[in-house]
């Protein structure tokens, strides 16, 4: 996997060996394998572990494991405790969203304070496929069908080339220890339902499902790039600004096909929804 990691990092222009990386280390198979590969490939990184205190003794077990791993491998480690339930209630958001906001807010602080170049997360090919189906079900449009991007600003995902199965097999072959999150097997969350119920069925129907979905996601990612370029070009032709006021050339818009989706793509960035755009076209 070392050569595949280095090839993926190079192909996607994620980072170089002189860059300082902050690696999100949960203690699970994905992040421990990524940390092991990064270490053995000679990349410079420190690790960051979030303790959300959502799973009682299991949360403390994870933190102890990560601390021991970092000490054994002489890797600088940052650990942060969070009152996730309190934050959730304060912000009136879901528990999942609360953990996400707390996690990335702290990561951004570390990057700014410690001078890291990139944040590396251990998302893999299965995560990307799950995200594709979640967005498909939610109706996010073409922008949501590219799965998880290898690079988003200074967030990089070097393990996207590998499936979960391959990661776990590598860990077992190398006797790499990791911890299991018991909530990953629960199917009350949409992502877990897709992982444990939908994907096994799709693999039974199409044994090459993992390879096929990965290729299709890559094609959709490239298609979206072309799509976005065309939208930007048309937006520049149809929108103008005078004294801080935006003007849309309706007559020119009406000559475009399909005008509905074009209008939505132009105006959605200003807070307009699909219903607003339909009202404009029917006025």
Question: At which residue positions do the language-model features occur?
Answer:
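Charged, solvent-exposed alpha-helical segments that act as regulatory interaction surfaces
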Residues: 142, 207, 211, 226-229
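Internal, active-site/partner-interface "lid" segment
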Residues: 184-189, 210-221
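AMP-forming adenylation/ATP pyrophosphatase catalytic core
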Residues: 2-30, 46-50, 82, 102, ...
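Conserved anion/nucleotide-ligand pocket segment
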Residues: 195-213
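Short coil/turn linker and secondary-structure boundary residues
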Residues: 93-94, 140, 162, 189, ...
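Core alpha/beta nucleotide-donor-binding catalytic domains of modification enzymes
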Residues: 1-199, 229
